[in-house]
Amino acid sequence: AAHGVDLRIAILSRGPRLYSTRRLVEEAKKRGLDPYVADPMKFSLFVADGRIDILHNGELFNYDAVIPRIGHSITKRDVAVLSHLEQLGIWSANTGAGILKSRDKLHASQILARNRIPVPRTTYVRAIIDVETAVDFVGGLPVVIKVTQGTQGQGVFLRHTIREARNLVQGLLLTGRSILIQEYIAESHGKDVRALVVGDRVVASMRRRARGREFRSNYHLNGTVENVDLSKEFEEVACRAARVLGLHI
């Protein structure tokens, strides 16, 4: 099974044509696996005394392991599916609880800070009157303002004055968003490093750089990427962060 002889593996993804999903399928096939791409929206869960079952598209879901490709759009229903799979003894690359914790920027920061992993100074703001106090707490202007759940650079803003910060927070609060005001790290302006952790080691890392005056380095915002070698210290921080958030990948 270790070499894919009898291992039945499924990739949980709503986008079988997405690049990341296709690459997982390609690499699995190279290892002699025959992966099945399963839409997480098409599971039905069954619970009875002493017994649980799960169907996908009307058929019994009979797999040994799953790789969830469920990101920022994860719902309580997706978490229920992953929990059901875990109870059936089906190994999951990431648990529903782990994905939920990592997708919420506030919750993730709380967990990392509690485990003495360095994070930018952060405040969670629910009232306009607290904006100035929050800015002072994180070290003064400029500040980064974020919604707690976002990806690909969406919902991340840099503000240079109290008035700008207050106006933005007011607008976001009116839309029902949860808002973080965060310390601006000058040395990381327009660039950051991403590490891919699998199990207990970093298997790949890259530096992302923004184009022009953009301070967000996301590839989806036309940023560029390049290979980077991480120091042992950075690798250990990345692995610890994944571990305390409950993520295998």
Regions found by a protein language model. Give the residues of each.
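Catalytic core of tubulin tyrosine ligase-like
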Residues: 157, 171-172, 186-188, 201-214, ...
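Glycine-rich, highly charged phosphate/nucleotide-binding loops
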Residues: 41-62, 72-78
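Anionic group-transfer/hydrolysis microenvironments
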Residues: 41, 71, 148, 184-185, ...
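Redox-cofactor binding/interface segments in oxidoreductases and associated redox assembly factors
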Residues: 67-68
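Short, acidic/turn-prone active-site loops that include or flank metal/cofactor-
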Residues: 40-42, 97-99, 209-210
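Beta-strand scaffold of nucleotide-dependent catalytic cores
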Residues: 168-169, 192-209, 237, 241
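Active-site nucleotide/adenylate-binding loops and adjacent lid/helix of ATP-dependent enzymes
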Residues: 3-14, 19-26, 35, 46, ...
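A long amphipathic alpha-helix within ATP-dependent nucleotide-binding catalytic cores
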Residues: 175, 215-249
